[in-house]
Amino acid sequence: MKNVLDTIKRVKEMGLWLEVVTLVVPGFNDTSEELWETARFLASVSPEIPWHVTAFHSDYKMSDTDDTPASTLLRAAEIGREAGLHYVYAGNLPGRVDEYETTFCPKCNTALVKRTGYRIHKVTVTPQGTCPQCGSAIAGVWSAFQAPDITGSPASNP
């Protein structure tokens, strides 16, 4: 684990974009103590590191372990926010993890990217990577970002 933590620190020090995903597995790493430890570590490196907590599904070779309930992901996400992380997401349980599918401005709490699962419904971050409401810089790689076509219209075939 030390190598993983050192790599997270190095990647951030190098100025590269980094997001961390934690697969929360019941009985393995789902205690509040373990989640707090992870969240505090990430916040100590940078509160702008996005942390995705995702649910385990008992498939394939680990079918004897329970699926991660939405309540556990919500608890993990709340711990992340309380630890000081600005961008915390609870993933892979679409529609069951409340506001933890949405990106909010850490300064004014404006909803910036609204999602359900992996589907983006609305993006309001400016092309310069700022909040349209308060002008705060939003962590991310926005220079290459193009807002998706979320109108539902089919793409044209040239």
What do the PLM-derived regions correspond to, one by one?
Residues 120-132, 146-157:
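Short cysteine/histidine-rich metal-coordination sites, predominantly Zn2+-binding motifs
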Residues 70-80:
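Short alpha-helix
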Residues 100-102, 128:
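Residues immediately within or flanking Cys/His clusters that coordinate Zn2+
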Residues 1-71:
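Conserved AdoMet/S-adenosylmethionine-binding subsite of the radical SAM
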Residues 111, 137:
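Cys/His-rich metal-chelating microdomains
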Residues 105-108, 131-134:
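Short cysteine-rich clusters marking metal-coordination/redox-active sites
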Residues 114-115, 140-141:
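Short, non-ligating residues that shape and space the ligands of small metal-coordination modules
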